[in-house]
Amino acid sequence: MILNKEFYKQGALILAKELLGKVIIRKVDGVTLRAKIVETEAYIGEIDKASHAYNGRRTERTEPLFREGGIAYVYFIYGKYYCFNVISGLEDKGEGVLIRAFEPLNEFDYLAKKRFNQNYDELSETKKKAITNGPSKLCIAFSIDKSENYKRLYDEGDFYIEEGEKDTFKIVETKRIGIDYAEEAIDFPWRFYIEGNKYISKK
């Protein structure tokens, strides 16, 4: 069942945890890819120096952050990679959730070829884990780029999120990664992941 628009009206800190275990659906190249979300980070523009929307900073690039919850925000980094975020909360709040890692559920050969130009059974165990264990890695594997920016994740199209299996798991809360510039926000425990999942980017 597709998650409805109301689900995304939750604040980023709540949504970042609620998204764990949910299933991303991506239809591309004639295949339907499925993956479980296993790691997220919350960003809250009003108080968070790590956020693109800190202190109400609003630009053409960051505009998706100020839209109503439930759309995709995809941005470009280092001149070659993409990161995928889910916008949370109400319009003009400037909040979002970075999706840091997926657990692939199907089409393993397709994903392996996208990431490493190899069949899945040719990969080492390390490479198998590395297919989607980071924000840019999962974008490569799932063909997520700027064309997904602003897409409504509650509409059944080629990119949306479904309710996952009713698994029981423990959520680990810890510091976010790669935000050394963010002063006191460095220490905010706003990264969340499923304990014991082998696809998380970093313990």
From Swiss-Prot:
What's the domain of life for this entry? Bacteria
The EC designation for this entry is 3.2.2.-
Q: Which UniProt keywords apply?
A: DNA damage, DNA repair, Hydrolase
The reply on keyword Hydrolase is yes
Q: Identify the Gene3D superfamilies for this entry.
A: Methylpurine-DNA glycosylase (MPG)
InterPro entries given in the database record: Formyl_transferase-like_C_sf, MPG, MPG_sf
Q: Which GO terms describe its molecular function?
A: alkylbase DNA N-glycosylase activity; DNA binding
Concerning its family, UniProt says: Belongs to the DNA glycosylase MPG family.
Query: Can you name this protein?
Result: Putative 3-methyladenine DNA glycosylase
Could you tell me which species this protein originates from?
Answer: Clostridium beijerinckii (strain ATCC 51743 / NCIMB 8052)
